[in-house]
Amino acid sequence: MEFCNFSNHFSTFENILQNQLRNASSNKFGIHQENKLSKFQQCLIDRVNHPEPEYNFEYEGITYTVFVYDYFSWGVAIDVPRNHVHYNSPASYFKNFYGASDYEDGKILVMHIDENSYSLCRQIISGEPEYHESHYVSFETIKKQAVSIIENLCKYQTRFLNNVSSLYGNHCIYDLSKLGSRFSNNATNACCGHHNFYDFSKLGSKLNKTLQTPKTNGKTSNPSMRTDRQTQSRSQTRSQTKPQFMTQFEPLFGTQTVPMFGTQSEPLFGTQSEPLFGTQTEPLFGTQSEPLFETQSEPVFRTQYESQPKFQSNHGPKQDYSSVFDLINTILSDKKSAYDVPKYQSQNTTASDKSENSYPSTVNNILDRIIGSLAPVGKSTNSNNSHNECKPKSTTTSKNSDFSQLSNNDLEKLISEAMGKVFPGAEIKVETIGSPNNTNSQSDNKNNVVVCNDGTVISDYVYDDEEDYGDYAEEEYTESGSNFSEDLNASEKSHDSDASESSDHHHDHHHDHHHDHHHDHHHDHHHSDSNEYQIIPDSNVPSDNICSDNLCSDYNKQNNVSTVDFNLEPTDCHYSESQYDNYSE
């Protein structure tokens, strides 16, 4: 062994060692004399007696090696058998239970490298003696410590095997050499016959199941009952058999490996997979998908689309008025085709889309929705009392009657019946501006007026696209009469050109008729008609019949009457400039 830079001191060590050996031979060197030697002398004598760097030994069938480290300091490495219960334990476990310094690669290492351990290397380098409280670990001391650790290994292994033997009794001695360990039968029989090692290979399936299956409530299990239970579990599903493969290792060691993975794997993946993915998928995706997507879709969608051509056949481009639907649509939409009527929309529309969803078209759409429930309508009696509900009476009218030849009174009755269908329970009144029998009347237009239960006034008056202030006025009077002048201000600003042209006419018209015709109009308005709601649809009505806002509003508040003018223009409203300024502010 080479000592690097310490070759100069080797001669001195050798001389000292020879003198110590000479004295020991003359004084019959013993243990009591060894204790009197210094640590330096003990290290030199130990190194002379054991000049080799390594010494291999075997105890209880376990091999260990005593080697030199740190220049004349001894250590030991113990090989742990692979089948030992603590083979893969962490290093901390060996430090706590075996007193080892470290554990790595299946070797227990014991080395005294703490500050209290004597080191010849430190003393040689420093030139000063080691601490007096330090102790030197000799070759025999480290060997005894290795033997103690091996005995503890055998003790823990025996305790583990005794727990196994308590369940199944004693068996033959375990031959560790069959599993690749360094144990031998000779060493086991000679050195550790008092240890009960067992042969796992001869125990069979009982021992393997015991090693891998935990106990339940401290009760031992019957092997025959376990076999029956396992046989029943094999007929179950794959998910139930999976934990049994994890806990029981019969297929790994015993002779049952062939039936477990050979014949029994066939029903798991062969016969059971066929009904799962073979036969069951056919009714799920094959036969059941046909009635779901093919047979059911035919009556649902074909009946709806087949009925549409029948609906269109009665309303061809000829427009022969063969049904009440065509007749009423033509009357209410100002001779427009039924196909030009927009679809039903909500009545909660703003002022910006009045031209698209006007009031008569809304009534027309409502009639469109309920026309399917109308019975053949013929001649009906007209109620003289406008407050009574209109009850249509079917008369003898042929299906092929030409409704275009009907008179205005008959058309009026038909419209009344249709409006009664649209608004059941409402008061249906047919109001005529002017006398129908008087040819000199100012207007012969007739309107259907519907008073709903909530007080909403609905009329089927047809007006031109330019007359768009009627719907605007109706919304303001039905919602809030006080907001009419404010919104009228915005409407007048949007029509500056029309308002500027008629500004002179407006003041003259307001001044002349506000004082001359107010009392007459108020008197006529109070006695001429007993209806709760007045509808003035025609723009040809003279301005004498239009009262001022203050007096009419007072009258309306007292008699609960709302006046709606569908042809209201910004220049036709009668108000004072002071009132207009107050509202605009």
From Swiss-Prot:
It comes from Acanthamoeba polyphaga mimivirus (APMV). Residues 232-241 have a biased composition (Low complexity). This is Uncharacterized protein L397. Residues 209-223, 379-405, 479-488 have a biased composition (Polar residues). The lineage of its organism: Viruses, Varidnaviria, Bamfordvirae, Nucleocytoviricota, Megaviricetes. Residues 490-506 have a biased composition (Basic and acidic residues). Residues 507-525 have a biased composition (Basic residues). It comes from the Viruses. Residues 209-244, 377-405, 473-542 are annotated as: Disordered.
